[in-house]
């Protein structure tokens, strides 16, 4: 499965608002949470990206037999989200990422920092 950075951003934005439990399987005893942003993704996609997010230490997540509990953003997750929260910064970050063909989370954060820095410099001109 390919990494979907928009899904990662959606999960981080939602986890800042509230915690949630997500089923690992369609037939899980846990019902899929009513989170609009997740409607466009499949359960396997969300679970896969939750694993990536957990491996990157952006969220505190517990994986159980039938579900995944998203508990809280880590400090690293908060700082990453600060860089990518604004939609205009996010769009510019994605455009630059595509132009230079890089898409790792680290690269995206670095690009977002540069985009934000550029906005700050331009503001004071």
Give a label for each model feature.
Residues 40-53:
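Short, well-structured hydrophobic secondary-structure segments
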Residues 5-9, 44-47, 71, 75-78:
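Non-catalytic, well-ordered alpha-helical scaffold segments
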Residues 89-125:
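Membrane-inserting effector segments that mediate pore formation, membrane fusion
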Residues 51-64:
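A short, conserved structural fragment
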Residues 38-41, 61-68, 107:
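Short acidic, glycine/proline-enriched loop segments that cap or flank alpha-helices
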Residues 15, 53, 81-84:
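Generic structural signal for hydrophobic core residues of well-folded globular domains
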Residues 69-100:
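Short, amphipathic alpha-helical interaction segments positioned at domain boundaries
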Residues 2-36:
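Short amphipathic alpha-helical interface segments
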């Amino acid at each position: 499965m390919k990494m979907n950075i928009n899904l990662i951003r959606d999960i981080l934005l939602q986890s800042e608002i509230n915690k949630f439990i997500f089923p690992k399987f369609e037939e899980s005893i846990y019902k899929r949470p009513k989170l609009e942003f997740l409607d466009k993704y499949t359960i396997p996609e969300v679970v896969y990206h939750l694993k990536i997010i957990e491996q990157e230490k952006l969220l505190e997540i517990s994986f159980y037999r039938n579900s995944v509990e998203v508990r809280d953003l880590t400090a690293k997750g908060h700082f990453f989200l600060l860089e990518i929260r604004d939609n205009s910064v996010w769009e510019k970050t994605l455009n630059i990422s595509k132009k230079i063909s890089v898409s790792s989370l680290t690269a995206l954060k670095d690009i977002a920092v540069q985009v934000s820095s550029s906005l700050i410099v331009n503001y004071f001109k």
